[in-house]
Amino acid sequence: MSKLDLNALNELPKVDRILALAETNAELEKLDAEGRVAWALDNLPGEYVLSSSFGIQAAVSLHLVNQIHPDIPVILTDTGYLFPETYRFIDELTDKLKLNLKVYRATESAAWQEARYGKLWEQGVEGIEKYNDINKVEPMNRALKELNAQTWFAGLRREQSGSRANLPVLAIQRGVFKVLPIIDWDNRTIYQYLQKHGLKYHPLWDEGYLSVGDTHTTRKWEPGMSEEETRFFGLKRECGLHEG
């Protein structure tokens, strides 16, 4: 696999970018997760960042990437509406894994947003998308810019939802390389990694949550529900960070 030119790839239409990365992705599919991270650090430009929502399985990618590239900036976009358990989980993992945590928030506080727009998450798909743009997308774009990121690691997995089922290991999003080291892991592999390294699921896992985001758009799993239906009232799966 040869070195990739980010600037040249960004000038291509999206379809052509996908085709240009196809050969590299075919090779990356043959590597294990650690190998993919090592390859990215050797062949893709810095600065490097890792994003995390500190959700159910967050400890896996946080541990895996940070072990190979210690002190990598870890981007959290904090909406102000996370579960108390999530905030405590963030503190616990930051201390345990010695994370270089970088927290980004919307330029408007949660209270100010409610005063201006009402409860956007109760206003259908359009309201949810506006909420996500304000609280997730803009802060992430700002983080990537301020941290001079050119390569972005994330912990998405194909098994999590239909919208992620065909994602490649390597893509370009928001103008930077995006690497998904554990994209092909299943739930058993996640469990085995956590057990091997003495790591925990998010505390709400034991209470029946399969996915955890904001308090007002996360539901506990019930029989017959898919994981996708536990977020955003089943209207959306993605919060906007991993779209586009």
UniProtKB/Swiss-Prot annotation:
Places the protein is found: Cytoplasm
Main location: cytoplasm
Keyword Chaperone: no
Enzyme Commission number: 1.8.4.8
A single MF term (Gene Ontology): phosphoadenylyl-sulfate reductase (thioredoxin) activity
Keywords recorded for this protein, A-Z: Cytoplasm, Oxidoreductase
Cystine pairings recorded for this chain: none
Pathway membership, UniProt: Sulfur metabolism; hydrogen sulfide biosynthesis; sulfite from sulfate: step 3/3
Cellular component per GO, a single term: cytoplasm
InterPro entries: PAPS/APS_Rdtase, PAPS_reduct_dom, PAPS_reductase_CysH, Rossmann-like_a/b/a_fold
Cited Gene3D superfamilies: HUPs (3.40.50.620)
Superkingdom assignment: Bacteria
Active site per the UniProt annotation: 239
Gene Ontology BP, a term: hydrogen sulfide biosynthetic process
Catalysed reactions listed for this entry: [thioredoxin]-disulfide + sulfite + adenosine 3',5'-bisphosphate + 2 H(+) = [thioredoxin]-dithiol + 3'-phosphoadenylyl sulfate
Family membership noted in the UniProt record: Belongs to the PAPS reductase family. CysH subfamily.
Main function: Catalyzes the formation of sulfite from phosphoadenosine 5'-phosphosulfate (PAPS) using thioredoxin as an electron donor.
Descriptive protein name: Phosphoadenosine 5'-phosphosulfate reductase
Organism per entry: Escherichia coli O139:H28 (strain E24377A / ETEC)
